[in-house]
Amino acid sequence: VGKPVAMLLLNGNATVTVCHSKTRDLPEVCRRADILVAAIGKAGMITPDFVKPGATVIDVGMNTITDPAEFKEFFAGNEKREHDFATKGSTLIGDVHPKVVEVAGAMTPVPGGVGPLTIAMLMSNTVKAAKLRRGEKVSSLAVR
């Protein structure tokens, strides 16, 4: 996820910094971002202290929580999530802690954020590819 997103942003003339879980002073580096894309693979790793107030946070992570204690750490007091967890015995969480919403200007949800957008773009590009195969003209296959 990291390299393709970085390339898309670079192609849009953004200044991009790519980090990983072992980046020194990761919270400090993240706090400089106007747009923070999290795809680190660890539930709730990006906490409010990683985020510049007003930043846009895009959470690409998909982690399943089955441990009730871990669930409470992230979702205590969230009645809808508590009901779903009690019913299913698990819940999805991204790489961004839910409390980041209190700091961020905008934040994608998990589930229901990046995943549906990815599916929509794949379908759009599939239709365009089929039209190209039939010799029809189409707009570019690039992500917009």
Task: Identify the residue ranges that each predicted region occupies.
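Glycine-rich phosphate/diphosphate-binding loop of Rossmann-like nucleotide-binding domains
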Residues: 1-60, 65-75, 88-98
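Adenosine-phosphate binding glycine-rich loop
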Residues: 68-144
